[in-house]
Design a protein with these regions (language model features):
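Structured segments of extracytoplasmic/periplasmic soluble domains
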Residues: 4, 26-33, 59-63, 105, ...
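Solvent-exposed loop/turn segments at secondary-structure junctions
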Residues: 5-9, 43-50, 108-112, 136-140
Length: 159
């Protein structure tokens, strides 16, 4: 499976349900083939929405991981405490592949949410069962939030 970006849909405006439904449909088809291994191509995937990565990882993870922590977002001391834990989604169990082995193809463009999929599956599948093939990834297994850091003003016609 080639995965180019973790995006919910056109302009990412309220397509979360559509995205999840499409993923469940696709993985129902995969599950009917009873795979014990899966090849995931993340070569040109710069990341995107963590919730999309969470959905994909929930479909690939061992069934025993469902409902357990996928990742925890930890904020620094300057930011109001907003630490959040995202769990593997247990409602995906009917489509979950319960894989024994995952092969992930990477490149120097693989980043962020893509790296989260790799790193967050390893504790549940084991390092030997999440096999990374390809180039070293960006090394940005973190997320970002935007904040306005300066006041925007218009020039005034003062003398």
């Amino acid at each position: 499976m080639v995965y180019n970006k973790f995006s919910t849909g056109p302009l990412d405006n309220g397509y979360e349900t559509d995205y999840a439904q499409q993923m469940l449909q696709i993985f129902s088809e995969f599950k009917s083939e009873a795979p014990d291994a899966f090849i995931l191509d993340l070569r040109y995937n710069p990341g995107g929405y963590l919730t999309c990565a969470q959905e994909l990882a929930s479909l690939l993870a061992p069934e025993s991981a469902l409902g357990k922590p996928f990742c925890t977002m930890q904020y620094n001391d300057i930011t109001t405490p907003q630490d959040t834990t995202y769990n593997f989604i247990s409602t995906t169990s009917a489509q979950n592949l319960n894989l024994n082995k995952l092969y992930v193809i990477t490149s120097t463009f693989t980043a962020s949410a893509s790296e989260a999929v790799i790193n967050c599956l390893r504790p549940y599948m084991g390092d030997d069962n999440v096999v990374v093939i390809g180039e070293t990834t960006v090394g940005k297994p973190v997320a970002m939030s935007g904040y306005t850091c300066l006041l925007y003003t218009s020039p005034s016609p003062r003398d």
